[in-house]
From Swiss-Prot:
Coiled coil: none
Protein name (Swiss-Prot/TrEMBL): UDP-glucose 4-epimerase 2
Reaction(s) the record says it catalyses: UDP-alpha-D-glucose = UDP-alpha-D-galactose
Catalytic residues (UniProt): 162
Any one GO BP annotation for this protein: monosaccharide metabolic process
Protein residues bound to substrate: 138
E.C. code: 5.1.3.2
Source species: Oryza sativa subsp. japonica (Rice)
Family named by the database record: Belongs to the NAD(P)-dependent epimerase/dehydratase family.
């Protein structure tokens, strides 16, 4: 976990797009604990405002450095207002749609949201002189490589619209750096984020049917689904199931701290890509067994056919990030499953349903230490918050801005 410290050069203000999402919310918490000020923008399309409230509660006194605006990046006018109110030192860009299957069915939606939204963001950043960016890319840009470990030099051949949108944005970033060397950009290619904050109060809350393995496993464990369907058990792997590189979401969040520090400390970073993974492959069955051990629950299995296009084995070589960002994943599969189960057992139906009820003796939110559980604001948040897309909330009284948009 990130230690509390101030980044070189003093406290800096960072815009976090998609900061209410799974990875984004964990990154916002780590940013606050590392001494940054974080302003979250999110359209809440596939995320929950309750995640931001829980970040505030977990951040304690650091929550005074947190603000939220409900903004869709495709609404350039709303984004302009956010930049007009605050001077940002850098942007961490998570916002985007991320379901591979949905991207195949609705490619235009993905290009509009992921690409057009990013173009708006980059244009507004440039207009306001903010030219430091950490972009949430994906290992999906590699497609289905035949060999592993996967390095940053592997061919970029995404095989679905989601991965293609990530590559398009990467290409845009490389193009704008070539035309304007003042830009400093880091592209972080994640492998498979799993786990949850060790407190059990932040985690993945997928809307609808989960798109990834771990949330599906957790839903079976808490009784929301009868069984887990494994897509293929005839791969040339140690147990016949696909092998992937799973990374704890807190390790991933800390990778963003390391990337930001690199942007601030380096005079000539340019536009660089880094893999964020553990460098170790874990099979589907190994994940299931580790989760059963962590939860004490038996996961019923159904063996289904392979999914077209899935690689047998895909894991990272994170040596470049270890060397240049001074970052290395700390958590193993057992810790990932432990924290995932801690989250799932406290929040079996995600954020919404348990913020107003008690289950198994636990208050999913109130036990952190403060807030009301009736849908009103919580620790660090103003009772009279306006949700009009223009006001940070909880910070209007405790972190007013001066005329230049800085926090006091």
């Amino acid at each position: 976990m990130a230690v509390e410290k101030t980044v070189p050069g003093g406290v800096r203000t960072v815009l976090v797009t998609g900061g209410a999402g799974y990875i984004g919310s964990h990154a916002v918490l780590q940013l606050l604990l590392a001494g940054f000020r974080a302003v979250v923008v999110d359209n809440l399309n596939n995320s929950s405002e309750l995640a931001v409230r829980r970040v505030a509660a977990l951040a304690g006194d650091h929550s005074r450095n947190l603000a939220f605006h409900k903004v869709d990046l495709r609404d350039k006018g709303a984004l302009e207002k956010v930049f007009a109110s605050t001077r940002f030192d850098a942007v961490v860009h998570f916002a985007g749609l991320k379901a591979v299957g949905e991207s195949v069915q609705k490619p235009l939606l993905y290009y509009d949201n992921n690409v057009n939204g990013t173009v708006n963001l980059l244009e507004v950043m440039s207009a306001h002189g903010c030219k430091k960016l950490v972009f949430s890319s994906s290992a999906a840009v590699y497609g289905s490589p035949k060999n592993s470990p996967c390095t940053e030099e592997f061919p970029l051949t995404p095989n679905n619209p989601y991965g293609k949108t990530k590559l398009v944005v990467e290409d845009i970033c490389r193009d704008i750096y070539r035309t304007d060397p003042e830009w400093k950009i880091i592209l972080l290619r994640y492998f498979n984020p799993v786990g949850a904050h060790p407190s059990g109060y932040l985690g993945e809350d997928p809307c609808g049917i989960p798109n990834n393995l771990m949330p599906y496993v957790q839903q079976v464990a808490v009784g929301r689904r009868p069984a887990l369907t494994i897509l293929g058990n005839d791969y040339a792997t140690r147990d016949g199931t696909g092998v992937r590189d799973y990374i704890h979401v807190v390790d991933l969040a800390d990778g963003h701290i390391a990337a930001l520090q690199k942007l601030f400390e380096s005079s000539s970073i340019g536009c660089e890509a880094y893999n964020l993974g553990t460098g170790k492959g874990t099979s589907v069955l190994e994940i299931v067994k580790a989760f059963e051990k962590a939860s004490g629950k038996k996961i019923p299995l159904i063996i289904g056919p392979r999914r077209p296009g899935d690689a047998e084995i895909l894991f990272s070589l994170p040596a470049k990030a270890e060397k240049e960002l001074n970052w290395k994943a700390k958590f193993g599969i057992d810790e990932m499953c432990r924290d995932q189960w801690n989250w799932a057992s406290k929040n079996p139906y995600g954020y919404g349903s348990l913020d107003s009820t008690k289950q198994n003796g636990h208050h999913s939110y109130g036990s952190i230490g403060s807030p009301k559980q009736n849908g009103h604001c919580t620790n660090g948040f103003s009772e009279s918050t306006r949700h009009n897309g223009h006001n940070g909330y909880g910070l209007v009284d405790s972190a007013k801005h001066n005329g230049n948009g800085h926090f006091h």
